[in-house]
């Protein structure tokens, strides 16, 4: 109690270095009205807790479920409300570019899809074997898989800071999105190349779809979401991509005389290079491994991986357009 009869109390304040100090918090101005003073103190503490929840953290302050990359040292969000996580899309933290690279990619692919729907309305033409009447559904399956992957990735990176339960769930959806994108990428080339021999496109598409389902089931095992299985996850995705070597070799033999063969092959090789290089950054965690803390918000491996995934998808889109144009003019 001070000389004016006010009640002063000691309040414990947490310090960043783990030590705690006490400071004097003046009592109320109502002659010892404990109820009013207590309410103000509770309100102040609530506001402090709210602000603390929205503060960016360092790696060592994170809960265990969010510790994924020890070379990114700062600017983390953790245990944020859904509302705060949503509005963090407009702030600058270490997930900002992860969100925006694939969110912009999703919007771009939506625009491409709408443009193609407006330009071509023949999803299931009556005579798919006649030139100019080629079915479009395999092409739109690829676009749908790409959009799902990009959107799932953006949502995962935006809301994974909410809770452990949501984090695990969104990681699974993210893995499912990557798998879906790989599976659906096979649909346009395999379908249009082997359209005149349906048994082959059925065999190849059934094969990659089965591999994808197995991959999703495997990755839905909670323990495989841990950082130590990063290389294993990448290996699963790479094995799905390498499956394409078999139908690609078959396609080269079947369409050796196709004048668009070389251009299409270049686009597909570019896609493979983009995906492999991006995966290399993702697994190696370069460049942040070389300079921890330097690339926390801009330029770390996952952001680079996202850019290469988007470039690979666009390269494959260009190849798919060539396949469509070829079948539109050639037919069976």
Curated annotation (Swiss-Prot):
The keyword Membrane is annotated on this UniProt entry: yes
Phenotype upon gene inactivation: Reduced apical meristem dominance and length of hypocotyl, and increased cotyledon curling. Mutant plants are hypersensitive to ABA and osmotic stress.
Membrane topology recorded in Swiss-Prot or TrEMBL: Multi-pass membrane protein
Main subcellular location: membrane
Superkingdom of origin organism: Eukaryota
Localisation per UniProt entry: Membrane
Annotated Pfam families: HlyIII
Tissue expr: Expressed in roots, hypocotyls, vasculature of cotyledons and leaves, hydathodes and guard cells. In reproductive organs, expressed in trichomes, veins of sepals, stamens and stigmata of pistils.
Protein's GO biological process: negative regulation of abscisic acid-activated signaling pathway; response to hormone; response to salt stress; response to sucrose
Composition bias, Basic and acidic residues: 26-37
Membrane-spanning segments: 99-119, 139-159, 173-193, 200-220, 234-254, 263-283, 304-324
UniProt KW Transport keyword: no
Induction of the gene: By abscisic acid (ABA), salt, osmotic and drought stresses.
InterPro entries tied to this protein: AdipoR/HlyIII-related (IPR004254)
Subunit structure comment from the entry: Interacts (via N-terminus) with SCRM/ICE1.
Family: Belongs to the ADIPOR family.
The protein's role, per its UniProt record: May act as a negative regulator of abscisic acid (ABA)-mediated osmotic stress signaling and function in cross-talk between cold and osmotic signaling.
PANTHER family linked to this entry: ADIPOR/PROGESTIN RECEPTOR-RELATED, HEPTAHELICAL TRANSMEMBRANE PROTEIN 1
Protein name as catalogued: Heptahelical transmembrane protein 1
Organism of this sequence: Arabidopsis thaliana
Gene: HHP1
């Amino acid at each position: 109690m001070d000389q004016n009869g006010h009640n002063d109390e000691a309040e414990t304040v947490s310090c960043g270095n783990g030590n705690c100090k006490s400071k004097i918090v003046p009592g109320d101005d109502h002659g010892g009205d404990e109820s009013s003073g207590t309410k103000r103190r509770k309100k102040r503490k609530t506001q402090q807790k709210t602000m603390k929840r929205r503060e960016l953290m360092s790696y060592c302050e994170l809960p265990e479920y969010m510790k994924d990359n020890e070379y990114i040292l700062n600017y983390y969000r953790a245990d944020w409300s859904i509302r705060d996580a949503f509005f963090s899309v407009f702030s600058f933290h270490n997930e900002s570019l992860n969100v925006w690279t694939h969110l912009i990619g999703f919007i771009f692919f939506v625009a491409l899809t709408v443009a193609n729907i407006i330009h071509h309305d023949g999803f299931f033409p009556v005579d798919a074997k006649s030139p100019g009447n080629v079915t479009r559904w395999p092409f739109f399956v690829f676009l749908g898989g790409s959009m799902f992957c990009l959107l799932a990735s953006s949502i995962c990176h935006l809301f994974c800071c909410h809770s452990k339960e949501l984090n695990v769930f969104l990681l699974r959806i993210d893995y499912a999105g990557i798998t879906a994108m790989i599976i659906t990428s096979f649909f346009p080339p395999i379908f249009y190349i082997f359209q005149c021999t349906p048994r082959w496109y059925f065999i190849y598409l059934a094969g990659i779809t089965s591999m994808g389902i197995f991959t999703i089931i495997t990755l839905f095992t909670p323990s495989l979401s841990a950082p130590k299985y990063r290389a294993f996850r990448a290996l699963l995705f790479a094995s799905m991509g390498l499956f394409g070597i078999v139908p690609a070799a078959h396609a080269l033999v079947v369409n050796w005389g196709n004048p668009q063969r070389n251009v299409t092959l270049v686009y597909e090789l570019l896609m493979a290079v983009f995906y492999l290089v991006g995966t290399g950054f993702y697994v190696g965690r370069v460049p942040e491994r070389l300079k921890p803390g330097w690339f926390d918000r801009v330029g770390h491996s996952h952001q680079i991986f996202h850019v290469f995934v988007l470039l690979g998808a666009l390269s494959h889109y260009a190849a798919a357009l060539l396949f469509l144009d070829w079948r539109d003019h050639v037919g069976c």
